Amino acid sequence: MAFSVAVSPFRTPMRTNYWMIAFMVAFLLVWANSYIGTTDMANWFLENTLVFFFLGFLIITYRKYQFSDLSYLLICVYLCMHVYGAKYTYAENPLGYWLQDQLHWSRNHYDRMVHFSFGFLLAYPMREFFLKWLKYPRWVAWMLPIEITMSVSALYELVEWAVADVFFKAQGDAYLGTQGDIWDAQKDIFLAFIGAIIATTIVSTIKRLGHIYSPEEIAAMNLKS
């Protein structure tokens, strides 16, 4: 079972896409564990609202828009990090506390890790979507993931504020996870931005070195040889 790092021109039914199935099973196990053992059910539902919509989008559009196995892996890792954070609330995450003790941090930085991962892990799938499915020029497909990461991060912070402050005041502090930092939202957006820049830089560098080829590029090289 080959592991693809670029979008294939051939459609693979979901029932025979074994990597996709493996990622789905892994995520569902983490998701179920986060639900069963959550310390704050109201916060869990708040944190997972967008997850429901995002998973629905991936499933509904699968026949038309299929990502590479690498993209599905990156998406799976990010979603697992997010729902693991929702299990305890970001501010009270055990892994964050452990890292805080080991690295002598002044706060629980698990929320910052997830925001950084939003840009770092999802920039590549976004690039695939713009380059392969929307057929945007390469330079646009490089820039848009960075711009969208910043825009979505800023929008998410506004949604967080609205939901926490207007609708669920009791869960507000836990949901926002600011831990007393008045610049928490700005730092979260910045970390997502940096993550996207690092990811696109790594992929661009690897492609320049010739280590990642799309199926079309491989076919073209075979024809020339």
Kindly give the residue locations of the regions a language model identified.
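Alpha-helical transmembrane segments of multi-pass membrane proteins
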Residues: 30, 34, 75-85, 123-124, ...
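Internal alpha-helical transmembrane segments of multi-pass membrane proteins
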Residues: 134-150
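Primarily interfacial, aromatic-capped hydrophobic alpha-helices that serve as membrane anchors
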Residues: 182-225
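Interfacial helix-loop-helix junctions of multi-pass membrane proteins
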Residues: 40-44, 95-96, 110, 153, ...
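N-terminal membrane topogenic signal
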Residues: 7-23
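Membrane-interfacial alpha-helical segments at the cytosolic side of multi-pass membrane proteins
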Residues: 53-62, 117-133, 165-171, 190-206
